[in-house]
Amino acid sequence: MAIKHYKPITNGRRNMTGSDFAEITSTSPEKSLLAPLPRKAGRNNQGKLTVRHRGGGHKRQYRIIDFKRNKDGIPAKVATIEYDPNRSANIALLHYLDGEKRYIIAPKGLTVGTQVVNGPEADIKVGNCLPLQNIPVGTVIHNIELKPGKGGQLVRSAGASAQVLGKEGKYVLVRLKSGEVRMILSTCRATIGQVGNEQHELINIGKAGRSRWKGIRPTVRGSVMNPNDHPHGGGEGRTSIGRPSPMSPWGKPTLGKKTRKKKNRSNKLIVRGRKK
């Protein structure tokens, strides 16, 4: 999908870019695959703020996505490529031969009319989903399961991809976008190809209001707050942090501090860590 550049007719339009939506073939979603998406504004069930900088934005409906791809052996035809406001990637509507309809994440190169299949016997073709043990070494994949049958959890955002590096016993070595090489059970499933809409990271939002449309509220620096609001706050004019390292609003070390648990059970499955 190409990037569209706007003319600088206003200060907000200057340097603003957006998607041209050339791949989108339908603007009306499948009603049977929609679910309500109540506004949370970053609050939990007690009404307490748990995620900052959330609130407002355009009303949305959730598109029910098939991350499990467990309908084996029944061919499906791509009916439409659609925009999804809840994720960076586009989605594709599949019409199965038995009449069922499902949404999937649209990989790069998937077009309307293409036939896709799930299952161990599926061909190595963009959009097909099969167990990792049936995928050749060197294949580019996305939507990877971590537990068999749970559904894809890794490599789902726009332009993301991973690669099968090798096979060792009941595990398959997969190199992720971060450079991390990880062992994943060979019975876990993955989809062939790279996630589409790879130009998404090049979009320049251009103005603050466009973030508000997405439900993102302003981020205020801690150094301009009062001492009771943030560890960096207070002082006369611009002052240093006054602590050994930068702190989060709750007094925890941040900006470089490792947060992964040292006794994480999945540590033994990581062959090589991510790039620094």
Curated annotation (Swiss-Prot):
- Name-wise, this protein is Large ribosomal subunit protein uL2
SMART domains, alphabetized: Ribosomal_L2, Ribosomal_L2_C
**SUPFAM superfamilies reported in the protein's UniProt record:** Nucleic acid-binding proteins, Translation proteins SH3-like domain
Q: What does this protein do?
A: One of the primary rRNA binding proteins. Required for association of the 30S and 50S subunits to form the 70S ribosome, for tRNA binding and peptide bond formation. It has been suggested to have peptidyltransferase activity; this is somewhat controversial. Makes several contacts with the 16S rRNA in the 70S ribosome.
Disordered: region residues: 36-55, 219-276
**What Pfam families does UniProt report for this protein, alphabetically?**
Ribosomal_L2, Ribosomal_L2_C
Q: Where, if anywhere, are coiled coils annotated?
A: none
Q: State the organism's lineage.
A: Bacteria, Bacillati, Bacillota, Bacilli, Bacillales
Family that this chain belongs to = Belongs to the universal ribosomal protein uL2 family.
Domain of life where this protein originates: Bacteria
* Biased composition regions of type Basic residues, renumbered to the chain: 255-276
The record's GO molecular-function terms, alphabetically, read: rRNA binding; structural constituent of ribosome; transferase activity
Biological process (GO) annotations? cytoplasmic translation
A GO CC annotation recorded here is: large ribosomal subunit
